[in-house]
Amino acid sequence: KAMTATASAGYNYMQEGIEYAVSGEIPCVIVDVQRCRGENYATQADLMQARWGAAGDHEMVVLAPSSVQELFDHTIRAFNLAEKYRTPVIVLSETTIALMRENLVIPEPDQIEIFNRIKPSVPREQFVPYAAAPDGVPPLPSFGDGYRILHSINPHDETGDIHWKPEEYDRLYQRITNKIKANYEDIVRTESYYLDDAKIGLVAYGSESRPALEAVERAREKGLKAGLLKLSTIWPVPEREIRELANQCDILFAVEMNIGKYAGEIERVSNGACEVVRITKNRGLIHTTGEILADMEQKLGLSLR
């Protein structure tokens, strides 16, 4: 199994390799510890690059840890998803988390769920490298198993041979994207806090979900029916959960440590069901709870502190 890690600037140079991994269906895990340009200050500015940085038609799986424990747990899950769907998986960490010191529970090895790639069940002479199973994922032998392994970034047929037939090109990339789209239930993860009766919703991911949750709890102490939707998976977008929250709430606050990027996705998915307000910070520091509450106060005309 393959993994590498970088911090923002280095992630730029990995985009061609990620494109290759998508097209060649090569399972791997990339950890990007987001930081401000040239400095070790905190940010969530690589959000769109994690989804759209690589060229060509593709879906990306991107996980957003909010703690040291989640960074550990999400990395294990990233390997499982990469192996299951033969795709690169991004763990989008942040300087905030990288510099944290927190307790970490490491389970016993037999308590950790591990998914190993599905290998061919046919004899070597019958193996077709890109003949997909019903779930859209071709079995993948390991190097040394004796099977013919061929990886190519170029359009190819089931045998792995390069070609330029338009219908084969379309068939290939429809399958590569659909194997992610069709497994929404398995890939997408969110956490809900105080949402049962919420009329004011906060949506956050990564380290920003920490002060956002405290802001929700403080607002509730003041009688405001607030709740938090925490996104553990940010790509694919948790559209169902965001849409349900938008239909339930009068207003959604999108809390981010950038100039306001994922808010656009929340607005798109909400589709006018409620107002979406951006709470952004782009100063190399995580939001404080007070800053989030101050922005909520300004919009709602209430005193929450």
Enumerate the predicted regions with their spans.
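Phenylalanine-focused residue identity feature
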Residues: Y13, Y20, Y41, W52, ...
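A structural-propensity feature for long, helix-poor, extended segments
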Residues: Y41-E59, C249, A254
